[in-house]
Amino acid sequence: MTDRLDGRTLIVTGASRGIGAAVSQCLLEKGATVIGIARDFQHCTIDNARFRPVPLDLAQVSALPDVLSRLAKTHTEITGLVCCAGRGRFGSLEEFAYKHIRELVDLNLTSQMYVVRAFMPIIKTNGGGDVVLMGSEAALSGGRYGAVYSATKFAVRGFAQALRHECAAANVRITIVNPGMVRTEFFNSLKFEPGSDPDNYIEPEDVASAVCGALFVRRGTVVDEINLSPLKRVVRRKTDDDDNWR
């Protein structure tokens, strides 16, 4: 077992900020080259010669097959994926416009499946590697106002479980990480957030440490699933309107 990733190239989605940026930084510190995918890098603070940003809006799923196919042809050295891109939207089901349901499914589920589909043949050709998918504690238990969001995360978890069986013979390890509330911009557009006490939230670096830890175990061992929770679970509403947490 080693804690170095020298010579490996991994793709990280959602790489410009939050969990994706923290994962990218951790991988870079361990010697990997990171192909970072994000909608834009305007606020990205990563400064490393082995970090290669690729501006790409994964929410535009109709364009992804062609774009990802071209990207795969130019990055045949890939041996791993860490899919961090995603967003949250909450509210009772009837409050969701149909287009908002589709948008959440497209980014949280379909785009992850497309990215894995595009690069899995390369990873297998290169002798195997790792795919890490970002789930959520909402993939473990559904909650009020989270029907659509939880559905996307439960689906990602099922995708990971099935892939694990499908890809083992090709030496590809599949891991899903299910974090609780992480202190990121995820909550900027929502009407609730974790309480201010640091024990009420997870830091992006905590998730990154878990991801890197899964990569460092012996090649014949798979870290199937990692569940991360804050020590406490206080949630603060930004509004007194109990009927709208979107």
Protein language model annotation of sequence segments:
Residues 16-17:
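Conserved glycine-rich cofactor-binding loop
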Residues 84-89:
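Conserved NAD(P)H cofactor-binding loop of Rossmann-fold oxidoreductase domains
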Residues 92-93, 100-105:
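Substrate-binding pocket helix/loop in short-chain dehydrogenase/reductase
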Residues 116, 152:
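Active-site helix of classical SDR
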Residues 121, 161, 165-168:
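Alpha-helical segment proximal to the catalytic Tyr-Lys
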Residues 136:
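Residue(s) in the substrate-gating loop at a strand-loop-helix junction
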Residues 170-172, 176-177, 194-236:
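C-terminal helical subdomain
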